[in-house]
Amino acid sequence: MIRETFHTDSKIKQVLFNKKSEMKLNYRLLEARFIDRPNRFLTRAELNGKIVESHLPDPGRLKELLKPGVQILLKQENGENRRTKYSTQAVYDGSTLISLNTLLPNKFTAHLLTEGKINFLKGWDIYKKEATYGKHRFDFHLQKEDEFMFLEV
């Protein structure tokens, strides 16, 4: 189980059963204060004294998390066709950092699996990502010698 998550600059760290693991991101996370959410895919935040709009990749309600004044993490985006210059990556709930980027938890889980940092999954290798079984899709298809298992993050 993940006990604590926190960030420093471009690193996301998680503590699992007192074992630290970190995954370096190829982008910087910018600290901002959440103001409001005009629609499902847009947030407004205060970043370095300026109000900016940011794309929110998670269209869920998130009312328990996105409250005025909470700290959020933004990623600066490049692209001429983008409506916003930022995307909202995570939000703090107290001292716990919660990912709002639906791709990041799978990347981090793959990293932890590869590093052998998840105790109950030691020895299991990633056989395939985004594996299908019948009409279902799973985040990971794992293999340990002649055994196989599906894992959903």
Per-range role (PLM):
Residues 82-94:
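OB-fold/S1-family single-stranded nucleic acid-binding modules
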Residues 7-9, 18:
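Intrinsic-disorder-associated, low-complexity terminal segments enriched in Asp/Asn/His/Tyr and depleted
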